[in-house]
């Protein structure tokens, strides 16, 4: 699962 760097 990838985390969104927002």
Swiss-Prot record:
Recorded superkingdom: Viruses
Cellular compartments annotated: Virion; Host nucleus
Coiled coil: none
UniProt keyword terms in alphabetical order: Capsid protein, Host nucleus, Virion
Statement: the UniProt record of this protein carries the keyword Cytoplasm: no
Record has Acyltransferase as a keyword: no
A GO CC term assigned to this protein in UniProt: host cell nucleus
Family: Belongs to the herpesviridae VP19C family.
Free-text function comment from the UniProt entry: Structural component of the T=16 icosahedral capsid. The capsid is composed of pentamers and hexamers of VP5, which are linked together by heterotrimers called triplex. These triplex are formed by a single molecule of VP19C and two copies of VP23 which bridge major capsid protein VP5 multimers together. Triplexes occupy the local threeflod positions between capsid hexamers and pentamers.
Subunit structure: Interacts with VP23, VP5 and UL25.
Protein name in UniProt: Triplex capsid protein VP19C
Species assigned in the record: Human herpesvirus 1 (strain KOS) (HHV-1)
Lineage: Viruses, Duplodnaviria, Heunggongvirae, Peploviricota, Herviviricetes
């Amino acid at each position: 699962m990838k985390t969104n760097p927002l």
